[in-house]
Amino acid sequence: MTRSINLHKLLLSTAISTMFGLAALSTNAYAVVPNDNNTADEIIDEDGGVNGVGIFYANGICTGTLINPRTVIFAAHCVNYRAAGDYGTSVPAAFAFEVDSLPGLQNWFANNFTSNPELFVYNVNEIIYNEDSLRTGFLEGDVALASLDTPAANVPTWALLFSPLPTPLGPGDTGYDPALGTGYHVNITGYGRSGIGSQGSIYGIDWRRRAAENMLGALTSLDASGDFLYGGGSGLPQNLYLTDFDDPNQTNIYDINVYQDDALPNEGTTAGGDSGGPLILDAENNVLTAEDLVLGVLSGGSRYFNGQVFSSYGGSSFYQPLFLFSDYIAANNPYRYVSTLEGDGDWEDPLHWQSDLDPNYRIIDSSGNVVNGFPETQPFGVQDSGNSGFGVICNDFSGDNAGDACRDISTGNPAPPSRNGGTDVITSNEITANLESQSGGDPLPSPTIDNGLA
């Protein structure tokens, strides 16, 4: 008993020192990387307020989305390096939902890991992660659920789309616009690192949520992308939702317009600490839906040249599509909606109750409408072949270059590159794939009195 009490006190004191030390070090540190037309301060999500996207803190930092008052969906690689049963017992964890999450997390630490709804911070009492994520770490099957020990009744929840997006127009179709690519406008958000497009995620984490826009670049697999870009797959057939980060000036030497579309005014990309955050199909810019929908959870980012830095122009981000894991999410969602059957019965009799459809589950019906529902067929999960999908993948440097080429993912046919102007200063045979997860935070310096960690 004495040993467990001492360990608990040590954990608490260490956690408080770490949190307050980081707060002292986090001046001008920033999440989500904007293009060079915006600053990291300008994309702080002040207008979003407490919107159901929160920061996850355990041994590192990730982002997650509240899907009911007791459940958050996020990325498995944020937690799958330990047994799921460790969380909520020997490893404290929490989600905080304020735009500036630091006051809530400090309060959670200082009060023995206690939820505080007034500060929108909630202790985690259980975590479940997809075992399929263990095979590749963060590349496939990267989905997890966390339950909160106190209902987050004062925090909005999000609807989840469990159907694949309809295949959009592609090259050769009347009305296809390569500047818009798939035509699906998405929002990205998270609490991770920030920076600027030309330099990548040069700023650390400051516990604030940031947001940016992008176009959905493709639904395809890392195998299919790799086959086109450098002539070989890597045993990763599962489809992913992908976005790229376009240079609005089309002058960056590493920007190959990897998923065909042009830069948006407030375009951005993801960085370390944004893992688990939502890919949002927003109602304002998409005729498909009258409400914002979560399409996927962030797993990581890619760069394509050794001299290129992560989270900079020309890179991309990849998300786990929720429609591939609808059965896993529904089976492991700890929050149930129930109602009584007709007729008299005892309150304690389980046969007098029925499970109801979760009001935040969405599908696209046969008429093309987004409705409350659940898929009739089981999804493929990590077994998805990657042969189906959509979007256009490109090796398209700025300028009219002999080696530029694109491929229509849905047909497998060549597609015309869309860029012109500018100068190509590197060659396509330098392309190589580098992937990184986007969890974690900044490593701590050695503890001193001055930095508050001693």
Spans of features found by a protein language model:
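A conserved glycine-rich beta-strand in the N-terminal activation segment of trypsin-fold
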Residues: 52-69, 137-138
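Sec-dependent N-terminal signal peptides
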Residues: 8-18
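Conserved H-D interstitial segment of serine endopeptidase catalytic domains
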Residues: 32-35, 81-137, 154, 330
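N-terminal secretory signal peptides that target proteins for export/translocation
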Residues: 1-8
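C-terminal segment of classical bacterial N-terminal signal peptides
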Residues: 19-28
